[in-house]
Design a protein with these regions (language model features):
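Compact, glycine/acidic-enriched structural inserts
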Residues: 39-99
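Aromatic- and glycine-enriched beta-alpha-beta binding-site module
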Residues: 5-66
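Generic ordered-secondary-structure signal
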Residues: 5-7, 23-24, 52-54, 78, ...
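Long, solvent-exposed, polar/charged low-complexity segments
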Residues: 87-157
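Active-site acidic/histidine clusters and adjacent loop/turn architecture
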Residues: 1-2
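Short secondary-structure junctions and interdomain/linker hinges
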Residues: 9, 68, 72, 79-83, ...
Length: 157
């Protein structure tokens, strides 16, 4: 909904203060990784991943990370990746997920409640003449992460 009825309200703030666009090869309802652009004054970002996967899929993603930790670390700890995406996920478990050891050295990668990444950008990023090229560069850095997650989802289905 673009507008809300503010005729009789003291609070005249708009219903929605941002514009977002999401692209996913498997469709917007898919659990596969997609690419998201969020435009909002003072809160712009480029993001992607598998947001709020259902519990069985989340278990499969955690198992894939556990079983392929060297490959996963080579993706998410790559300096070129980390310069844009310093953190994996937004919400985390406080302890080890069920079925995984509490003393696992890379537990932080298993504690994710979703496998997403986000790159916050200043508003000026989207006003620059080369913002499409720079956006493309950022999403190219995210591709290996997306591929890892998508391969796991493909195997799960």
């Amino acid at each position: 909904r673009i507008y809300r009825d503010t005729r009789f309200s003291e609070d005249k703030t708009p219903y929605k203060t941002h514009l977002g666009g999401y692209i996913n090869a498997k469709g917007k309802k898919s659990d596969h990784c997609g690419y998201y652009v969020h435009l909002e004054p003072g809160n712009c970002l480029l993001a992607g991943g598998s947001y709020c996967p259902p519990p069985p899929l989340l278990r499969a993603l955690r198992q894939a990370v556990h079983d392929n930790i060297d490959e996963f670390r080579s993706i998410v700890e790559d300096p070129a990746f980390k310069q844009y995406f310093p953190v994996i996920g937004e919400n985390f478990l406080k302890t080890a997920p069920k079925g995984f050891p509490k003393d696992y050295p890379y537990l932080k990668y298993l504690q994710c409640k979703e496998y997403t990444v986000a790159c916050c950008q200043p508003d000026s990023f989207f006003l620059a003449p080369d913002f499409l090229d720079r956006t493309d560069d950022i999403f190219k850095q995210m591709k290996r992460f997306s591929d890892f997650v998508n391969y796991t989802i493909d195997d799960f289905e």
